[in-house]
C-alpha cells in the first residue's frame, strides 16, 4: 500500500469528508497506519528552526519516516552560522520560540545567539530527533519521478560521495538566511587586508587597534558595529541609506519572573500572546501611505535632527523612504556609536576597492586593515543553487525567472508534495518569523 493511499485516507479523498482539526487528523493517521497504508517518507532540507519544527510536528502526527538533511555538522541554521559580536534576536525571546516548546527561563528580553542556539539544540533532545539527522549531507538537486510519484534527491556527503534517494514529500527548510551575499565590487580580490562576511565571522582575527571598514548597514551591522567600534582604532561605515532604528529596551529577566513563568505556564503564555499582539499592531505603520507611518517618519526625523552637525549629515541619519520599506531595526547603542570620535559614516557610493582601502564616488580613499561585509543574504534566490525539476521537466528557476511566488509561500503548481518554509513573500518586518514557520508547518502537516 503506497503513501498516496495513506494520504488519501487521511485527507478524506477516497473515504469521506476531509479531516479537520489536529485530534481528528491524528486519529485518521493512526487508522490509516492500522489499515496497512505506508506512511509517507518525508525529506526535510535544513536543520534550522524550520526543519526542526517540521520534524517535530510530523512525528507528533504519527509520521515517523522523516530525514533531515543538513550540509553543516550540526543543527541551528542561521543561529549556528552567525556568531559575530553582539549577535542576538531582534524579536522578544518568548515569541522567538515555538508555542509547543516554551522556554520559561529566557535570560533576557532579547536572547543572545548562544542561548537561541542552545534552545534549538534542546529540541533535538526533547523530541528525540537524533535518528532523523543526516548532517554533512547536502541535497544538490531534486527531480520529480512521475511514474513512481516520488522525489529523487541528489546527495553529496562531506567526502564528496554522491548518492540518490527517494522521498514521497520534500520540505525545504533552507530559509532565506543561509547564503551570505557579497557584492561584486571591482578590486575586492586585490585588497591586502583581511576580508570576511558577518555571517562567517573570523574569530581568529584580532580587530583591536585596526582600521576597520564595514560595507552594508542592516540588521547584522546594527549589532556588531558597536562592539567593533569599541576595539578598533578607527571604523568607517559605508552606508547606502539610513535606517529607522527604534529603542531596544533590552533587559535581563529577574529570577522571580522566570520562576513564575516556570510555575504557571499560563502566565508565560499570556505574556507571549501580549508580545504577539503588540508587534502585530505595528503592521499598520508599514502600510503604504499610512497616516501612522507618516507620523512615525516625522517624529523620527524630529528626534534625530539635533544630532546633525559637522560629524553626521542628515543623509546619514534620516531615512528618505517610508517606514517598512526596510526592516525597522532596534538598538540602544547605535547613535552613541555613530558619535564616537573613531567612527565615520560615509554615504557616498563605494566605487572600487584598492589593495589598501576603499574608494568612494567622491574619489576619496579610506585606508583599511580589515573589511567586513554586513550585506545580508541572497534572500530572493530561494532553493539556489539546488536545481529543482518538477512535472514534465519544468525547472523551478525557470518558473521563477520573473520573480519567485508560491501559494501561501509554501507550494508551487507543477511541483507535487514539495513544501517551502520561509518561502517567497513570507518574510516579516514586524513580528516573529518562528510564529510564521509554525503556522506553515501546521498547514503542511
Pin down the residues of each PLM region.
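A conserved short coil-to-beta-strand element within the FAD-binding core of flavoproteins
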Residues: 135-150, 344-361
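Helical element adjacent to the flavin cofactor pocket in flavoenzyme catalytic cores
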Residues: 116-133, 327-352
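Beta1-alpha1 glycine-rich phosphate/pyrophosphate-binding loop at the start
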Residues: 3-8, 40-133, 239-240, 306-312
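Glycine/threonine-rich phosphate-binding loop and adjacent beta-strand/alpha-helix elements that clamp
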Residues: 374-445
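Core beta-strand elements of the Rossmann-like FAD/NAD(P) dinucleotide-binding domain
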Residues: 159-169, 208, 361-370
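Rossmann-like dinucleotide-binding core of oxidoreductases
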Residues: 32-39, 45, 49, 53-74, ...
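Feature captures the FAD/FMN-dependent oxidoreductase FAD-binding
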Residues: 108-177
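Short beta-strand to alpha-helix junction loop
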Residues: 103-122, 288-295, 321-333
